[in-house]
Regions:
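Long hydrophobic segments that form regular secondary structure
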Residues: 85-126
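Glycine-rich loop/linker segments at domain edges
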Residues: 16-101, 179-181
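General beta-strand structural signal in soluble alpha/beta enzymes
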Residues: 1-2, 32-36, 118, 177
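Structured beta-strand/loop patches that form or line metal/cofactor-binding pockets in enzymes
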Residues: 2-19, 177, 181-182
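Predominant activation on well-ordered alpha-helical scaffold segments within soluble catalytic domains
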Residues: 1, 22, 67, 95, ...
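Flexible loop/turn segments at secondary-structure boundaries
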Residues: 6-10, 41-45, 123-128, 182
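Accessory "access/gating" subregions that flank catalytic or transport cores
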Residues: 119-182
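Conserved active-site and cofactor/substrate-binding residues in soluble primary-metabolism enzymes
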Residues: 61, 93-100, 111, 134-141, ...
Length: 182
């Protein structure tokens, strides 16, 4: 058996990713097009990396309707132990890419990211990038239920107010819809 130091030095971790993207939106914040290139850190050899990358690939649109999408990806061999499957199995990495893009859009437009997210949520009869038509989706209903229960805009305002009056500590808030599985 390995001691803890040997175990940490020789076993894989969650796959680290980098990504480059271009995203196009209209004046109202509706996403029109999204192009993303994912770089996956596989480690010394592939192991389970191709399957994890495949899941990331399928989840780069998150829970949003994006009419025009192009996804490219590469698994990079690096000088570390091979990475392994972890909870989420590539979905968090693909989701992180689109969520980051949405936050950048919101910042440039001077609105909260939750506004952009709500406008682009998957709705009944939307089609996913790989051709699956959603006859019925609960994304919008879940968002609206959450908003009724916690008043998203009010909580965001409370966080902003706290952050403007406190210099040493800050708070954050996020709402992230997750689409998992196909």
């Amino acid at each position: 058996t390995l001691n803890r130091n040997e175990d940490i030095a020789t076993t894989g971790k969650r796959h680290a990713y980098s990504f480059d993207y271009k995203i196009g939106v209209d004046a109202d914040g509706k996403i029109l097009a999204y192009e993303v290139f994912l770089y996956q850190q596989a480690g010394a050899f592939a192991d389970i990396s191709p399957a994890v990358l495949g899941r990331s690939f399928l989840h780069t649109s998150g829970s949003y309707y994006i009419p025009n999408i192009k996804v490219s990806a590469v698994s990079c061999k690096t000088n570390i132990p091979p990475n392994n499957a972890f909870r989420g199995f590539g979905v968090p990495q693909g989701t992180f890419a689109i969520e980051s893009a949405i936050h950048h859009i919101a910042e440039k437009m001077g609105v909260d990211a939750s506004e952009i997210k709500f406008k682009n949520l998957l709705r009944d009869n939307d089609t996913l990038p790989y051709g699956m038509r959603l006859e019925k989706t609960n994304a919008l209903r879940c968002w609206e239920t959450l908003d009724k229960q916690v008043d998203i805009a009010k909580r965001i305002a409370m966080v902003k107010e706290y952050n403007t009056t406190n210099t040493k500590t800050k708070r954050g808030i996020a709402v992230i819809p997750v689409c998992f599985g196909i």
